[in-house]
Swiss-Prot record:
Naturally occurring in which organism (per UniProt): Schizosaccharomyces pombe (strain 972 / ATCC 24843) (Fission yeast)
Lineage, top ranks: Eukaryota, Fungi, Dikarya, Ascomycota, Taphrinomycotina
UniProt entry tagged with the keyword Ribonucleoprotein: yes
Family: Belongs to the eukaryotic ribosomal protein eS6 family.
Alphabetical list of InterPro entries matching this protein: Ribosomal_eS6 (IPR001377), Ribosomal_eS6-like (IPR014401), Ribosomal_eS6_CS (IPR018282)
Protein name (Swiss-Prot/TrEMBL): Small ribosomal subunit protein eS6A
Length: 239
C-alpha cells in the first residue's frame, strides 16, 4: 500500500510505498477523520500523529466520508457531494464509491500530519513550499500585514514574477486586482447609485400622485355621466 502523507503546515506532501502489512496494521478498520499514531509504521515516524483524510482502492474508486463500510457501494450523488461533479444544473448520477473504513483493498491511503514527531522526514517536514499567490481581498491584505484602515493597501500587494515563454524577453511582475478596495472613485460611484435611486423613487411618487389624481377625475366624470343618464331616463318615464 502507498501512503500519501501531507504536511499542511509547510504545504508539502510525499508518497511512500510500504510492502510490510504489519506496519500498516494500525490503520486497518479505522475510519476517515480518525487520528492514528505513527510509531508502528516505522522508526522514522516515531512521535508522529496522522489523520486519515481519504484514499483510493486498487480500481481507483475514492473513499467517501459517511459510508461506514469496508467495500464499494453505488450511491446516487448530486451537486455538493464529494466524488462527483455535475455537468448540468440539478443533474444526479449513481456512482461507485469506496466506504470510509480502511481495508486491505486500498492502493493509496491519504494521511495528514497532525503532530510532528522527534525527527524530520526528508522532503516532507524539512522543506517549506511557499504559497504561489498572496491575498487578493483588501481586508485579507490588511490582516496579513497588520495594517490599519488609514494605510494604503495597494502598496502591500504581493507581486509575482512571470518568466516569458519567448527567449530573450525579460521577466516581469504581475499583481492581482484588489477586490473590495474602497477608493474615492468607488465612494463616488456609490453616492451616484444612491442619488439615482432617490431620483427614481421621487419620480415614482410623483407619477403615482398624478395617476391617482387622474383616476379620481375619471371616476368623477364617470359618476357624473351616470347621473345625467339616470336623470334623462327618469324624465322620459314621467312623460
Amino acid at each position: 500500500m502507498k501512503l500519501n502523507i501531507s504536511y499542511p503546515a509547510n504545504g508539502t506532501q510525499k508518497l511512500i510505498e510500504i510492502d510490510d502489512d504489519r506496519r500498516l496494521r494500525v490503520f486497518m478498520e479505522k475510519r476517515m477523520g480518525q487520528e492514528v499514531p505513527g510509531d508502528s509504521v516505522g522508526p522514522e515516524f516515531a512521535g508522529y500523529v496522522f489523520k486519515i483524510t481519504g484514499g483510493n482502492d486498487k480500481q481507483g474508486f475514492p473513499m467517501f466520508q459517511g459510508v461506514l463500510l469496508p467495500h464499494r457501494v453505488r450511491l446516487l450523488l448530486r451537486a455538493g457531494h464529494p466524488c462527483y461533479r455535475p455537468r448540468r444544473d440539478g443533474e444526479r448520477k449513481r456512482k461507485s464509491v469506496r466506504g470510509c473504513i480502511v481495508g486491505q483493498d486500498l492502493a493509496v491511503l491519504a494521511l495528514a500530519i497532525i503532530k510532528q514527531g522527534e525527527q524530520d522526514i526528508p522532503g516532507l517536514t524539512d522543506v517549506t513550499v511557499p504559497k504561489r499567490l498572496g491575498p487578493k481581498r483588501a481586508s485579507k491584505i490588511r490582516r496579513f500585514f497588520n495594517l490599519s484602515k488609514e494605510d494604503d493597501v495597494r502598496q502591500f500587494v504581493i507581486r509575482r514574477e512571470v518568466v516569458p515563454k519567448k527567449e530573450g524577453k525579460k521577466p516581469y511582475t504581475k499583481a492581482p486586482k484588489i477586490q473590495r478596495l474602497v477608493t474615492p472613485r468607488t465612494l463616488q460611484h456609490k453616492r451616484h447609485r444612491f442619488a439615482l435611486k432617490r431620483r427614481q423613487a421621487e419620480k415614482n411618487r410623483e407619477e403615482a400622485a398624478e395617476f391617482a389624481q387622474l383616476m379620481a377625475k375619471r371616476v368623477a366624470e364617470a359618476k357624473q355621466k351616470r347621473e345625467v343618464v339616470k336623470a334623462r331616463r327618469a324624465s322620459s318615464l314621467k312623460k
